[in-house]
């Protein structure tokens, strides 16, 4: 009777009886890294994001992913900090018993310790901290009841009665053993501690990952919010700053938590919670490179933004080769290059009056940054005669701009299928490589500014934007949207500082023309200038008479203003959670609004683009 028959062993270990440990998918570290980056942007501390990732991995039963999470978190950390990380993850795993059960937790924690580097494993705490005794049993039960009441008030007593109807010992076990003995840390406990905020995040994560327990998830979402309301979040300052926790308990923050858990479940289990399949169901295939169907591979390649890590350099190399082919095989188109060089030649001779600086296709109508850039090109290209050298310089400008655009799109989580489209634009290659327009440097300045804004480098970004604006005035077009975002992100007073940076940079680039300042600003920033029909592309379908008419110009201006107002009302001010009238009041307030920090947290990289 001590041995089992082969048939019985086979039945016990059958794949359909219960899914086994989940191998680490190839992209799981990238998912962990993204969650960490997003949490850090929101000023959430390590306990918050590491607690979510650890709890989801424990629930999905993936020991390999657990050690991958540890490795990515502890990389380049000193040994003592790596020990703290391992202790914390182990403590999170222990709390998962209350949601995932004992057997799975045993297997996961054993596998986790066995995979740790020997020096880390040997440094882990080996002394129990939750041993019951006559001296601490009352305190443990009191802690459990206090946590229960804090989470479920004002329904705490009704829930106890309801649980007691199911089984009289059920509320006793849950409150005393789970909430008191497990979910709360004993006083004076050495090593890793898991506070109220992180415990709620663990509960939400485990239950969400299991699926099928929506009411319990809802209860712990409310429990997380009550931790903010009663101030117990302050007992765990490592979880995040005040503004970060305020955001975390908001609708937006809770949505973020649930979405991150869903991403982990999708990555680790193909979207199925591991505790939910029916007994006769075969587990779904893991979304790994080896097992995915061709359709799933294509879908993953098109929508999983982690692929942009390798896609961006590949596309840049391909486009660099394409640029070479375009320059060598397609004739250069002369439109403004010669005129630019004629302008620069006059400036080098000492002319500073914009009304006297003219060339083959017209007068100089661009600001000082344009002059400075093309003065350098004048020197490098033998006074503009070496066109091919200029084309290769513009190819470098194009590739640099494209790299910035890629990074801005990647930061905004644009899906990968969009990226190849960026290198297929015939018009972009024409503008940069075949015509050498100054639009190239203006766009470079714009996307360099967006790159900085997305990374909270606002002062540098405003200088770069001002530089692009002083190449070509077309950069005034995105300025209204940028102003609204700055007010919400930085506050109206700091937004005024950035307006001054843009103004002062404009004055700086105009300094060489200070003796003819009126002609400089009149020509370089002339808003009433009428464009020549010959050079239009987008309005070629209308007649020249219509294009040059005043009603047509006023009509376009009206449409533009209408679109600005529409975007202002329907999209730009959304993060402020204000009506248009209320928003206008914060533009010039006597003091910053109370919710400025919360409003600022809603300005994310995807809004910048």
Swiss-Prot record:
<dbReference type="InterPro" id="IPR029032">
    <property type="entry name" value="AhpD-like"/>
</dbReference>
<feature type="transmembrane region" description="Helical">
    <location>
        <begin position="468"/>
        <end position="488"/>
    </location>
</feature>
<keyword id="KW-0328">Glycosyltransferase</keyword>
<dbReference type="InterPro" id="IPR007873">
    <property type="entry name" value="Glycosyltransferase_ALG3"/>
</dbReference>
<dbReference type="GO" id="GO:0005789">
    <property type="term" value="C:endoplasmic reticulum membrane"/>
</dbReference>
<feature type="topological domain" description="Lumenal">
    <location>
        <begin position="452"/>
        <end position="467"/>
    </location>
</feature>
<dbReference type="Pfam" id="PF05208">
    <property type="entry name" value="ALG3"/>
</dbReference>
<feature type="topological domain" description="Lumenal">
    <location>
        <begin position="1"/>
        <end position="388"/>
    </location>
</feature>
<feature type="transmembrane region" description="Helical">
    <location>
        <begin position="389"/>
        <end position="409"/>
    </location>
</feature>
<keyword id="KW-0256">Endoplasmic reticulum</keyword>
<keyword id="KW-0808">Transferase</keyword>
<feature type="topological domain" description="Cytoplasmic">
    <location>
        <begin position="489"/>
        <end position="549"/>
    </location>
</feature>
<feature type="topological domain" description="Cytoplasmic">
    <location>
        <begin position="410"/>
        <end position="430"/>
    </location>
</feature>
<dbReference type="GO" id="GO:0052925">
    <property type="term" value="F:dol-P-Man:Man(5)GlcNAc(2)-PP-Dol alpha-1,3-mannosyltransferase activity"/>
</dbReference>
<dbReference type="GO" id="GO:0005783">
    <property type="term" value="C:endoplasmic reticulum"/>
</dbReference>
<feature type="transmembrane region" description="Helical">
    <location>
        <begin position="431"/>
        <end position="451"/>
    </location>
</feature>
<feature type="transmembrane region" description="Helical">
    <location>
        <begin position="550"/>
        <end position="570"/>
    </location>
</feature>
<comment type="function">
    <text>Dol-P-Man:Man(5)GlcNAc(2)-PP-Dol alpha-1,3-mannosyltransferase that operates in the biosynthetic pathway of dolichol-linked oligosaccharides, the glycan precursors employed in protein asparagine (N)-glycosylation. The assembly of dolichol-linked oligosaccharides begins on the cytosolic side of the endoplasmic reticulum membrane and finishes in its lumen. The sequential addition of sugars to dolichol pyrophosphate produces dolichol-linked oligosaccharides containing fourteen sugars, including two GlcNAcs, nine mannoses and three glucoses.</text>
</comment>
<dbReference type="GO" id="GO:0006486">
    <property type="term" value="P:protein glycosylation"/>
</dbReference>
<comment type="pathway">
    <text>Protein modification; protein glycosylation.</text>
</comment>
<protein>
    <recommendedName>
        <fullName>Dol-P-Man:Man(5)GlcNAc(2)-PP-Dol alpha-1,3-mannosyltransferase</fullName>
        <ecNumber>2.4.1.258</ecNumber>
    </recommendedName>
</protein>
<keyword id="KW-0812">Transmembrane</keyword>
<keyword id="KW-1133">Transmembrane helix</keyword>
<keyword id="KW-0472">Membrane</keyword>
<comment type="similarity">
    <text>Belongs to the glycosyltransferase ALG3 family.</text>
</comment>
<feature type="topological domain" description="Lumenal">
    <location>
        <begin position="571"/>
        <end position="609"/>
    </location>
</feature>
């Amino acid at each position: 009777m001590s041995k089992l028959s082969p048939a019985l062993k086979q039945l016990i270990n059958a794949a359909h009886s219960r899914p086994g440990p989940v191998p680490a998918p190839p992209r799981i570290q990238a998912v962990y890294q993204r969650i960490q980056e997003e949490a850090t942007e929101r000023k959430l501390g390590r306990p918050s994001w590491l607690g979510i990732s650890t709890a989801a991995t424990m629930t999905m039963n993936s020991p390999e992913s657990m050690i991958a999470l540890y490795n990515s978190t502890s990389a380049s950390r000193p040994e003592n900090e790596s020990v703290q990380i391992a202790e914390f993850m182990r403590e999170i795993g222990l709390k998962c018993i209350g949601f995932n059960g004992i057997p799975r937790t045993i297997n996961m924690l054993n596998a986790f310790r066995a995979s740790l580097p020997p020096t880390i494993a040997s440094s882990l705490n080996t002394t129990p901290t939750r041993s019951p005794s006559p001296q601490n049993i009352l305190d443990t039960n009191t802690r459990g009841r206090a946590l229960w009441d804090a989470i479920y008030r004002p329904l705490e007593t009704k829930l106890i009665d309801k649980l007691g109807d199911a089984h009289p010992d059920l509320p006793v076990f849950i409150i005393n053993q789970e909430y008191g003995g497990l979910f709360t840390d004993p006083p004076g406990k050495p090593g890793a501690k898991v506070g109220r905020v992180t415990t709620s995040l663990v509960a939400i994560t485990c239950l969400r990952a299991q699926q099928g327990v929506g009411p319990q998830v809802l209860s712990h979402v409310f429990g997380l919010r009550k931790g903010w309301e009663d101030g117990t979040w302050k007992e765990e300052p490592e979880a995040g700053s005040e503004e970060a926790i305020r955001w975390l308990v908001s609708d937006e923050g809770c949505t973020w938590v649930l979405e991150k858990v869903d991403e982990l479940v999708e990555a680790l289990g193909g979207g199925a919670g591991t505790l939910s399949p029916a007994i006769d169901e075969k587990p779904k295939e893991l979304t790994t490179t080896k097992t995915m169907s061709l359709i799933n591979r294509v879908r993953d390649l098109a929508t999983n933004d982690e692929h942009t890590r390798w896609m961006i350099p590949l596309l840049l190399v391909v486009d660099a080769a394409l640029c070479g082919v375009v320059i060598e095989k397609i004739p250069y188109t002369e439109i403004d290059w010669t005129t630019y060089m004629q302008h620069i030649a006059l400036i080098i001779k000492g002319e500073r009056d914009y009304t006297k600086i003219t060339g083959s296709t017209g007068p100089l109508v661009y600001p000082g940054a344009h002059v400075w850039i093309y003065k350098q090109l004048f020197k490098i290209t033998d006074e503009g005669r070496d066109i091919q050298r200029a084309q290769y310089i513009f190819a470098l400008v194009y590739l640099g701009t494209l790299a910035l655009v890629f990074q801005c799109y990647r930061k905004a989580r644009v899906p990968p299928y969009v990226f190849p489209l960026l290198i297929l634009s015939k018009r972009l290659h024409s503008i940069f490589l075949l015509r050498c327009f100054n639009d190239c440097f203006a766009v470079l300045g714009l996307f360099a500014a967006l790159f900085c804004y997305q990374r909270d480098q606002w002062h540098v970004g405003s200088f770069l934007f001002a530089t692009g604006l002083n190449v070509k005035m077309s950069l005034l077009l995105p300025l209204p949207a940028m102003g609204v975002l700055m007010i919400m992100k930085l506050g109206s007073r700091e937004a005024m500082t950035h307006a001054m940076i843009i103004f002062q940079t404009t004055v700086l680039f105009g300094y060489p023309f200070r003796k003819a300042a009126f002609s400089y600003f009149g020509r370089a920033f002339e808003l009433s200038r009428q464009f020549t029909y010959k050079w239009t592309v987008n309005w070629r379908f209308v007649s020249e008479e219509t294009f040059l008419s005043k009603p047509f110009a006023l009509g376009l201006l009206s449409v533009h203003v209408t679109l600005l107002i529409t975007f202002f009302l329907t999209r730009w001010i959304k993060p402020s959670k204000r009506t248009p009238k209320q928003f206008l009041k914060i533009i010039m307030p006597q003091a910053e609004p109370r919710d400025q920090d919360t409003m600022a947290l809603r300005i994310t990289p995807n809004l910048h683009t």
